[in-house]
Amino acid sequence: MGEFGWICGFSADAGFINQAAERFTTYAAAQRAAAGQIRLALMLDPSQPVLLPTVVPGVAHLPLQDLSRKPFRLLHAKVALLGFRDAATAGQHHLRLVVSTGNWTRQTLEESLDLAWRVDLEVAPDVADDAVSRADMMAAQGLFAWLLDLHDTRLLEADTPLSGRDAADHVDQWIARCNRAPRARPRLLDTRSRSLLDQIIAGLKREGGVARSHLCMGSGFYEAATVRKGGTGTPVLPHKIVKRLKASQALSPRARVDLYVNPQACQAIAGAVDHLRLDADHPIHVRAAAAPAAVFGAGHERTLHAKFLFSSNRSTTTGACNSAWLYLGSGNLTTAGLLNAASQAGGNLEAGILEFPEGLSWKKSADPSRWIENLLPIGGNTLDDLPSLQPGDPWAPPPPQHVAAPIAYLVWRADGRLTRPDPTAGDVEVLDEAGTPCAITADGYTWSGPAPRLVRVRWVAGAEARLAWVPVIDAHGRVAATPLPAIDLDHAWTQLAAFPGLPDEEEGEGEGDPGIFPDDRLTGPKRRTPRNLTPGSAIRQMMMLIEQIAAQQTAVDAVDWTAWCNRLEQALFQARQCPAVTCFVQMQLNPLSPLRAPAFRPDFAEDAGTAAGRHYEQTLRRIELAWETHDYAPLEGRQ
């Protein structure tokens, strides 16, 4: 089960992200929307439209803090760093790092020809002794720490265990265990300070000066033609790569060099096939990328989007890929993608890996997983027919769409107010459903109607009026969550028994979307008409629940205690109008009083002498107030 994860990329869509969130958390969108808990932090290029938490529940799409100071041309790196917990084994954790050449979109899954690389690491309770994988995790954490400093993280830092703050801290602590001897150099590369090509060359030099006889290069996007000294318009970057590799003695003078393209969109390559093939410095053969039949099935066509460099010697007897190395990542074979470090004018933020794989073969062997044409899209034909090649449509970075608002979220109060977490955040209007500014109060705004999941805010930046949606955190700390229905004690226990997970989605739940502005039918407190329930039956039901709660919470880990208290308060709040609670109000008894006994609490929270104990007692007090039993005699004192 996913604890927390960070994702960065150029673009993403709701279809992909919802699938990813469901696989990560194991919960469907409706369950995540009801939980209102942030489990994934998403950072995309600011040119991309915002993915709202009502559309991708459990995911916070973070905006850049200051567009004018972004230290890259494009946020193009495609990396995910994920932390998982084993719900069945305390202290058993798992880290996963994914580096992709594709965007986080349905197009990547269904149409593109892309590559991905991943590494997994167990943390139980100490991290596995894999120095290189530990170094990769630390490198990824450094990249995301740098990105988070540039983004608006106030929502993740909100004072609720459901904001993602505590879960992110847990995963950070797991990754911190990776920082120990022996240490190794990470395979993960990024362009915060150096270009990808510079880092690739440096890595090859450290590995040793072995000249390889084959080089395969592929990219989903190439740059426009540049006029060379001889007057011929031809792309120069492929030859720059070859020249750098030869100069570092990583490529032999007469090596075979193949350049893989999407024939329908290969930019300057489309008009330069002969120039590349006949180049006096080093011939480069242009070939079509091919989707491996072992992966996609025979005859399945996909468009190349992957970016890769693969080089090795080839055994004349076995066909083995000797002295092999592989780069794959987000950096296209362009100046901004491969040659430059990140900068606002000339370099993208890119990420990739440099790997030295063993056991691969140029020949189709008995083990399909070792045949290089099953691993890389390099099985296509040589392209000599210039009319069949197309440059594709030109592309330029779109204008920014996702910008940080002066306020990152609002907090709902029971009296119909939306309060601002930071009263000094500047002049901001909150617009109601009709687009009319809400009345301003001392600490926020007056909202007419039931609690919204999101609200639209308006402010002025310079001379420009801006609009953005911001989430609303409800009284239970849930972020942009769907309304809570009234439940009975059995359903309350179902929610508690599933902790730290979520209860199964019941039939009929999740059909339709209550939307951003739910109506009173969905949000108003509901007092169910009590069925005939005798005091004895109510006491038996309640005592069973109290015993179940005690057994459950005495086994909760200290790191999960705040989240448990939040779940306890939410579930019992939802049950405040059920017949059993109504019966206790009529009997003027407080049924929650036994939960204060030390035997019903874990050791670290058995009394008010600890912060955990005080937090628990405050939670019980709020539940008693919601149940209206706070002034009544304790249940255990009943004669």
Locate predicted features.
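Terminal interaction modules at protein C-ends
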Residues: 1-327, 332-639
